[in-house]
Swiss-Prot record:
One of its GO terms (biological process) is tRNA 5'-leader removal. GO terms for molecular function: ribonuclease P activity. It comes from Methanococcus maripaludis (strain DSM 14266 / JCM 13030 / NBRC 101832 / S2 / LL). Optimum temperature is 36-38 degrees Celsius in the absence of L7Ae, 48-50 degrees Celsius in presence of L7Ae. This is Ribonuclease P protein component 2.
Length: 130
């Protein structure tokens, strides 16, 4: 059985609040592909793997992205150079960067933070999807 890493050895993360300006509404898969393609075009495979982008939350046009702490500047520059997606203009604006999802939601997205267990309770009350 594998042991979990202690906090001192874990990878340091930053959370980025994004605003995506695009003609149509993008799905989560599209947002992930746009961010990864921007990183691949700017810094290659090695830079993309070091940045380790992970989409935490997305509701058109805002999203929260988790990245490595050391690669914040790489993400900023690669997203600023991103010009088009599917031959249509796209602009990805970074609203803010923080070290916790709670601060991102409250400070930059102006959404009250709900603890995870409350979200699960709401989903259980709604019942299964049909």
């Amino acid at each position: 059985m594998l042991k979990t890493l202690p906090p001192t050895l874990r990878e340091k993360k930053r959370y980025v609040a994004l605003e995506i300006i695009y003609e149509m509404e993008l799905s989560q898969k599209d947002v992930i592909s746009v961010v990864r393609n921007a990183l691949l075009n700017y810094s290659g495979v090695l830079g993309c793997s070091r940045t380790n982008p992970w989409l935490i939350d997305y509701g058109h046009p805002y999203g929260i992205l988790r990245i490595s702490r050391e690669e914040v500047d790489t993400l900023r520059s690669s997203l600023s150079l991103m010009g088009e997606h599917k031959k249509k203009p796209i602009n990805i604006r970074i609203i803010g960067i923080s070290n916790s999802v709670k601060h991102i939601r409250e400070k930059f997205l102006h959404v009250p933070h709900e603890p995870y267990y409350k979200v699960i309770q709401k989903l259980k009350r709604k019942g299964p999807k049909k």
